[in-house]
Amino acid sequence: MKNYLLQIEYFGKNYCGWQRQSHSLSVQEELEKALSKIANQNIEVTCAGRTDTGVHATSQIVNFYSNAYRPLSAWQRGVNALLPQDIKILAVQQVDNNFNSRFTAINRTYNYIIYNSATSSPIFAEHCLWENRELDIDKMNQACEYLLGEQDFSSFRSSQCQSNTPFRNIQKAEFIKQGSFIVFEVVGNAFLHHMIRNLVGSLLKVGLGFESPEWIKVVLEAKDRTQAAETAKAHGLYFVGVEYPEFSFKRQIIKLFC
């Protein structure tokens, strides 16, 4: 039995998210179906981070076990030929049998993309959040400082979150402006359900001048979801990287735009 790692990219608009669901189409279902056909046996995969409905990935990491002998090219080109256009395998490699794409991960990186322009873009409308009002990035970054370290993020978790603990360790949270795009990059050991989108929703209130940077600290300390802002839309969020003890994968979405 061999353990294979896949780096995959997908556009999440047409899917209920990563995880297989009985009622609608998922990225996991499409990938497992294609892999199973190439392997001529049932294949089940594990991913580094389960994305929600409408969320995208430029560097999702997946692993699966199979005793079917296939060259690496078959696991990539052969499976890609069976996958829909909005899901593709970028790379494949054999890894140690102890490797688990989820539990071996040290941290995960997400990007949230905001198109900050007076006029919306037909081209980028499905790829990022449009905000026509000017955003104060300096204040947003001041607010981000309160997010760093291991903290209780109850104020930013959804009511459907099934995690046993609200504590998460954030190593980086920063807004970067590149032309008309504003990129929120956040790195953490893991994230709660809707956590990043809830953070973005609240940080936008700071950037628009409705709240001070210190307000984020107040919301955190409240440990109450009702004290934070509304959830930012899913289509601006991208899973872009994972770090493991021996290697890492990262493809920043803004580098694909610019």
From Swiss-Prot:
Keywords: Isomerase, tRNA processing
Residue positions binding substrate: Y110
Domain of life, source organism: Bacteria
Cited InterPro entries: PsdUridine_synth_cat_dom_sf, PsdUridine_synth_TruA, PsdUridine_synth_TruA_a/b_dom, PsdUridine_synth_TruA_C, TruA/RsuA/RluB/E/F_N
One protein family per Pfam: PseudoU_synth_1
Membrane-spanning intervals of the chain: none
Gene Ontology terms, MF aspect: RNA binding; tRNA pseudouridine(38-40) synthase activity
GO biological process, one term: tRNA pseudouridine synthesis
Residues annotated as the enzyme's active site: D52 (nucleophile)
UniProt-listed Enzyme Commission number(s): 5.4.99.12
Reactions mediated catalytically: uridine(38/39/40) in tRNA = pseudouridine(38/39/40) in tRNA
Function field: Formation of pseudouridine at positions 38, 39 and 40 in the anticodon stem and loop of transfer RNAs.
Quaternary state and interactors: Homodimer.
Similarity comment: Belongs to the tRNA pseudouridine synthase TruA family.
Protein's name in the database: tRNA pseudouridine synthase A
Record gene name: truA
